[in-house]
Structure formats: C-alpha cells, structure tokens
C-alpha cells in the first residue's frame, strides 16, 4: 500500500487489485484513465467491459457518471471489483456488476461511453458485440493495444461504424478514443 496525500483538484482511487488486472500503474490503465479524464461523464451511462479490478468503473463513478455497468467473465475479478468499489465508498446498489459475455448480460441497453482495457485481439472480437450497445453519439475508449496491433484494431473499429478521434501512446502501448461515424 502507498500512502498518498490528495491534492485539491484530484480524484483518488483506492485499490487492492488482488490478482485482477488494473492497478493504474500499467501504461494501458493510465492511458485510459487520462482519456476518461478528458470526457464529460456527468449523468452519462457507461460500461466497463472486462472490468478486472473495477478501476475504470470507479473512475467513471467519481467523474460523475449516472449509471455505471461493469462486466467480466472471471468470477475472481468480479469479487475484486466489488471489494474495490466498496473501498471507494461506492455502494453495490449504485452500480451494476455483471458476470458473463457482453451481449448475454446486457440486453437492449445502449451506453453513452464504453471503456475497455483488454488486449487488442480481444478488442477486435468484442467490436462485433460493442456495436450493438452504442448510441448515435457514443464515445468508445480503448486501451491495451500494443503498437503493432493498432492498425488492426482501427480497421475493425471502422468496419463496425466507428472512427478514430484520438490516439495516445506510452512506450509500446496505445489507447484510443473512437466515435460513432455520422
């Protein structure tokens, strides 16, 4: 555990990642958190696909999201996410944490913001499902993309009706903000 003195303009997330992914220190997580900070989450409906430690759900809630969903296929990650939500004073009644594949657990729901920090090969597969949960003005924030896989992710995203608005980089890792094509 690290002690940290919060600055006046900061939101601080407390985490015990256990064996779940997402401590905030990995470049993919920090890149996605930076992208999240640049968006307006006020009263938005968001989903964190592959929630892991729950760090992105927590960030979304702290940034003002109205409805926050998180999905994961791993039972252990679900437990870690629950613990971390509670550690950050977020009641499990305030969020929806769902175990299972995306379209199996999300029925007829559309989201303003989709966040996902998973390896590129998984992102490419998920895009076929993500397209069904987007609104006309949704924002999609992806991370977990190694440099040489970025073109593949972008190509797939474009094939399902998204366009790249921004790419951030840290060492060999890439993160991107995607918008629904008008």
Outline where the language-model segments fall.
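A generic "binding-loop/recognition-motif" signal
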Residues: 2, 52, 172
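Generic hydrophobic-segment detector
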Residues: 8, 12-14, 50, 71, ...
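Conserved SAM/SAH cofactor-binding pocket of Class I
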Residues: 19, 23-102
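S-adenosylmethionine
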Residues: 34, 73-181
């Amino acid at each position: 555990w690290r002690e940290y003195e919060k600055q006046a303009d900061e939101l601080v997330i407390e985490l015990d990642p256990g064996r779940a992914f997402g401590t905030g220190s990995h470049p993919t997580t920090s890149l996605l958190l930076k992208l999240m900070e640049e968006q307006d989450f006020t009263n938005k409906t968001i989903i964190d696909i592959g929630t892991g430690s729950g760090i992105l759900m927590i960030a979304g809630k702290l940034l003002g999201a109205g409805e926050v969903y998180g999905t994961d296929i791993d039972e252990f990650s679900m437990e870690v996410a629950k613990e971390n939500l509670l550690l950050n004073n977020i009641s499990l009644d305030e969020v929806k944490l769902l175990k299972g594949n995306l379209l199996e657990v999300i029925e007829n729901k559309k989201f303003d913001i989709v966040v996902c920090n998973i390896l590129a090969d998984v992102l490419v597969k998920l895009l076929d499902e993500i397209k069904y949960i987007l609104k006309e003005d949704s924002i999609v924030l992806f991370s977990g993309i190694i440099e040489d896989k970025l073109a593949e992710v972008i190509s797939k995203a474009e094939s399902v009706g998204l366009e790249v608005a921004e790419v951030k980089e840290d060492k060999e890792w890439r993160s991107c903000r995607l918008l629904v094509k008008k």
